[in-house]
């Protein structure tokens, strides 16, 4: 007799099943507008729940340390081939468990402890792993930063000046809260001027890059990382890409045996499924709509008197500043949550409030676009956001708007069950 239970989750663990069902209801009834979140397909989730969960596969395709890896080899190679086709690169490592681990592997491959790293200031829209002091990237390496100017945009001439003064070994370009297109060609010119590697972290805009709705980091960057969720709508994970064979070898060694052991084969299978979806012609339509919907947010919020960092957006998000308001990003986040709209509080350039309070919110369009919402829905939602912000302490209004938006959400349901 097998020791493995054949019960479904609902019958095997009612407590966990109940919690997951609650999350399904939250995702269905609320409007998800956190820029880094998205909805993945049932097929992707089905692959994540497959029997590959049981398989160890240390090493790389056809070079494993375990037996029985023929199917693990096949699915990982498929994911690699599809990733290279999407981004037009020669080499891809699909094993990183997260974007942060992908970034850690790049540093491990190309830097030594104490080497100089130049990345975007976290408070100006960068990411923890781009040299922020609390992060391993700021502790293991000598990190320096560039930021945005008074207009909320990068000044590439200024970044060149900083690079010449710092003389970094690697320059990181990419952001987690920057609403403008990043010019990778100009960054490569800066890197070449100081003899640095150019490392592009495209975690936030990868889905747009895949559809030619944002400049590609190739052929400009020496190495590129991304998450596989966010705008790529895949499983939670990371990926590293390059056109340089020697860098690819170093990256592979940095991932395994450097910072990871066995890859998550079930997640790699899900990445392969997501990559096939991205290769479908409909992906371009999705990415174009993501940008169009973000532009609606820009127009409405600006018309209603709200300040946007950089004045607007070129991608999937807007960053709203409350520096001139008597409420904080935390206040706005909580008020919008009461109204059934999920965003995240976010620091803004020259923020006077703590990172736990902030003076801004980040609003994204990818998740609601995935649900099928277009300009008309986004105009309605943007105005409701402004109504909440205009009446930040009116909880009765927030509850009323919540009910209205819940009715809207009923017309854009993705999932009919919580597990796949």
UniProtKB/Swiss-Prot annotation:
- Cofactor dependence: pyridoxal 5'-phosphate
Its function, per the record, reads: Catalyzes the reversible interconversion of serine and glycine with tetrahydrofolate (THF) serving as the one-carbon carrier. This reaction serves as the major source of one-carbon groups required for the biosynthesis of purines, thymidylate, methionine, and other important biomolecules. Also exhibits THF-independent aldolase activity toward beta-hydroxyamino acids, producing glycine and aldehydes, via a retro-aldol mechanism.
State the protein's name: Serine hydroxymethyltransferase 2
Annotated (6S)-5,6,7,8-tetrahydrofolate binding lies at 122, 126-128, 246, 354-356
InterPro entries assigned to the protein according to its UniProt record, in alphabetical order: PyrdxlP-dep_Trfase, PyrdxlP-dep_Trfase_major, PyrdxlP-dep_Trfase_small, Ser_HO-MeTrfase, Ser_HO-MeTrfase-like, Ser_HO-MeTrfase_PLP_BS, SHMT-like_dom
Q: Which PROSITE patterns match?
A: SHMT
Q: How is the subunit organization of this protein annotated in UniProt?
A: Homodimer.
Pfam family membership, one:
SHMT
Q: State the Gene3D superfamilies in the record.
A: Aspartate Aminotransferase, domain 1, Type I PLP-dependent aspartate aminotransferase-like (Major domain)
- Taxonomic source organism: Sulfurimonas denitrificans (strain ATCC 33889 / DSM 1251)
Say which domain of life the source belongs to.
Bacteria
Q: Which GO terms describe its biological process?
A: glycine biosynthetic process from serine; tetrahydrofolate interconversion
Gene this protein is translated from: glyA2
Q: Where do transmembrane segments lie in this chain?
A: none
Example of a GO cellular component annotation carried by this entry: cytosol
Give the record's keywords alphabetically. Amino-acid biosynthesis, Cytoplasm, One-carbon metabolism, Pyridoxal phosphate, Transferase
A GO molecular-function descriptor: pyridoxal phosphate binding
Q: Which reaction does it catalyse?
A: (6R)-5,10-methylene-5,6,7,8-tetrahydrofolate + glycine + H2O = (6S)-5,6,7,8-tetrahydrofolate + L-serine
Family from the record: Belongs to the SHMT family.
Modified residue annotations for N6-(pyridoxal phosphate)lysine: 230
NCBIfam families named in the record: PRK00011.1
Which HAMAP family does the entry mention? SHMT (MF_00051)
Pathway where it operates: One-carbon metabolism; tetrahydrofolate interconversion; Amino-acid biosynthesis; glycine biosynthesis; glycine from L-serine: step 1/1
- Residues the UniProt record annotates as site (Plays an important role in substrate specificity): 229
